[in-house]
């Protein structure tokens, strides 16, 4: 069995770049990072190299989702922001040599608009998969229960 540790959730008592060494010390060969975008690519590459780790997954930027907002991937009025997030994600994904990019659908607080949000998400997911496939990067999306994240699609 192969396991990857999520450095966004584990070793949170340590500064982010020190978590790579902790993961290696605990026997991990692979890591995932939810949102690496606050850390320069070169710093992450160095931490991976120094600790002989592979980054296997990152999330596509999700806008305000983690702060309680709707996010980006499914919001009809945020297609330009989503496109910009795709560009940033692709740069990180290629540089870090990840094999998977996770897209968080987001929230819809208006049940009457849910069908439009799902349609937007489907279109964005297809665009994302088409953009990442030439680099052998798999696009995934995550289902989150609505008790932990109300109104999640």
Predicted features and spans:
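N-terminal pre-domain/capping segments
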Residues: 1-94, 98, 126, 133
């Amino acid at each position: 069995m192969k396991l990857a540790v999520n450095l966004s959730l584990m070793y949170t008592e340590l500064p982010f770049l020190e978590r790579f060494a902790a993961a290696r010390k605990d026997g991990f060969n692979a890591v995932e990072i939810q949102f690496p975008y606050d850390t320069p690519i070169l710093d992450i590459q160095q931490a991976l190299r120094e600790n002989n780790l592979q980054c296997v997954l990152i999330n596509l930027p999700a806008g305000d989702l983690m702060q309680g907002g709707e996010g980006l991937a499914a919001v009809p009025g945020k297609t330009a922001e989503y496109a910009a997030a795709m560009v940033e994600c692709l740069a990180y994904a290629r540089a870090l040599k990840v094999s998977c990019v996770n897209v968080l659908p987001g929230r819809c607080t208006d049940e009457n608009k849910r069908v439009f949000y799902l349609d937007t998400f489907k279109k964005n997911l297809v665009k994302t998969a088409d953009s990442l496939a030439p680099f052998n990067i798999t696009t995934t999306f995550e289902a989150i229960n609505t008790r932990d994240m109300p109104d999640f699609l």
